[in-house]
């Protein structure tokens, strides 16, 4: 009897111990589950926060490098960066540096990324990256993976509302333009030469606008007349750049131009869906004006000049072909053909023109070659904490050779100091893509 009672007591104790252990195990499991859930929640929270900081980190790095008008935004479809290269003399180099930074620290995870490049706060091109997943992993992004196009997608409407860092507005640039002119009109001398150093103040007060005030300082003048011996103003202009839907770009410039002209000039370019092809148009209403020192003499009568044509860009060789019908300053009307090949540090090509004067008489054919070269230094610009004007040589300089020595017909003007064949091609998508791939 005693043994039976003792056995029952032992069994009860064992059952109580098992119940205690089960309760302890359940409590321990619940505690561990709570801890794991909390850790997972914190990890997800910090991951989202880290993802948001990634775009901001890339923006801050670009600002430190000297890029202006920098910002970013993101939605469910893609992440978008906006930037303007004010740090490097060449757009291709600057855009390539920006791509490297964004690839390193600013790409979203498993989502497309777009970079919209501005010029004077006006969107020019976009670079688009689409990540490719292979075997449950994402390949490392490289420069060759970015598509370059005039197309901004649907991102610009959202990106234009973003508050940009390091604004380019109200910042003063002083660019010194070395200007060389040559002519061969006499037998006993090979060339007459004119060499000027022409500093220009450039500043923007609102989006797309640029004010240019240039002073021409003669260094050497042999054969170009007494007026060129005097210090006098050069370009005094206000320009407004704009972009319309369907890849239409334009620029309106008013003021005092070169070649002794003043007035207004409008340029409009349209790029087809096949971006190798484009339509080009230009309209000018100008009069004669010249400076004697700082006194301006002008004729109030105005004349119309115009140009309309098309262009084709050969991406394999970075070569631009254009054919245009034009009316020049002496009211002669004709056609002009140009072929320009663009390299990283220069652009060079030739041109040919044939026309008739205002009375219908044939004007002799003229042509020649032209080139534009990048000026040193080839590195970065520097702005001293935005307190002082940034002083540099102009990005490039060029010459036009008149093979038939035509002095009267086929004359034209340059509306803005920075207008040249190299600058006009600086945002060409095919050229930017070649810069990304080759350098």
For each of these PLM feature ranges, what is it?
Residues 82-85, 174-186, 211-219, 245-257, ...:
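Transmembrane beta-strand segments that form the barrel wall of outer-membrane beta-barrel proteins
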Residues 48-52:
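Sec/Tat signal peptide C-region and signal peptidase I cleavage site
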Residues 219-228, 260, 280-313, 324-336, ...:
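Outer-membrane beta-barrel translocator/channel fold
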Residues 178, 197-203, 238-242, 266-270, ...:
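Residues on the lipid-exposed face of transmembrane beta-strands in outer-membrane beta-barrel proteins
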Residues 35-47:
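Bacterial N-terminal signal peptides
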């Amino acid at each position: 009897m005693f043994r039976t009672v003792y056995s029952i007591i032992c069994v009860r104790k064992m059952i109580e111990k098992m119940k205690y252990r089960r309760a302890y195990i359940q409590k321990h499991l619940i505690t561990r589950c709570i801890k794991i859930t909390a850790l997972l929640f914190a990890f997800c929270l910090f991951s989202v926060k880290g993802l948001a900081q990634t775009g901001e980190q890339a923006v801050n790095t670009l600002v430190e490098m000297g890029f202006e008008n920098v910002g970013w935004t993101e939605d469910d479809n893609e992440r978008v960066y906006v930037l303007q290269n004010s740090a490097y003399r060449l757009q291709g180099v600057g855009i390539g540096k920006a791509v490297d930074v964004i690839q390193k620290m600013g790409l979203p995870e498993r989502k497309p990324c777009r970079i919209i490049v501005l010029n004077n706060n006006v969107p020019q091109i976009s670079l688009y990256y689409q990540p490719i997943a292979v075997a449950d992993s994402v390949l490392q992004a490289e420069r060759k993976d970015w598509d370059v196009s005039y197309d901004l997608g649907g991102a610009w409407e959202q990106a234009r509302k973003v508050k940009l860092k390091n604004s380019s507005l109200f910042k003063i640039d002083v660019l010194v333009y070395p200007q060389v002119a040559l002519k061969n009109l006499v037998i006993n001398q090979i060339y007459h030469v004119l060499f000027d150093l022409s500093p220009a103040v450039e500043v923007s007060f609102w989006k797309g606008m640029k004010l240019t005030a240039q002073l021409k300082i003669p260094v050497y003048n042999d054969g170009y007349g007494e007026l060129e011996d005097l210090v006098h103003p050069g370009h005094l202009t206000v320009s407004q750049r704009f972009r319309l839907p369907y890849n239409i770009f334009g620029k309106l410039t008013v003021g005092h131009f070169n070649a002794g002209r003043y007035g207004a000039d409008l340029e409009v370019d349209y790029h087809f869906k096949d971006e190798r092809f484009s339509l080009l148009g230009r309209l000018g209403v100008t009069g004669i004006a010249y400076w004697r020192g700082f006194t301006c003499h002008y004729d109030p009568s105005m004349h119309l000049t115009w140009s309309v044509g098309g262009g084709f860009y050969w991406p394999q060789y970075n070569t631009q072909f254009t054919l245009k019908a034009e009316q020049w300053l002496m009211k002669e009307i004709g056609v002009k053909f140009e072929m320009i090949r663009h390299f990283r540090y220069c652009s060079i090509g030739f041109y040919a023109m044939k026309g008739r004067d205002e009375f219908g008489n044939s004007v002799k054919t003229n042509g020649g070659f032209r080139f534009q070269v990048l000026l040193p230094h080839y590195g970065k610009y520097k702005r001293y904490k935005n307190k002082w004007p940034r002083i540099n040589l102009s990005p490039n300089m060029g010459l036009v050779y008149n093979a038939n020595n035509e002095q009267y017909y086929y004359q034209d003007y340059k509306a803005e100091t920075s207008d040249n064949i190299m600058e006009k091609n600086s945002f060409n998508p095919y050229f930017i893509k070649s810069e990304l791939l080759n350098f």
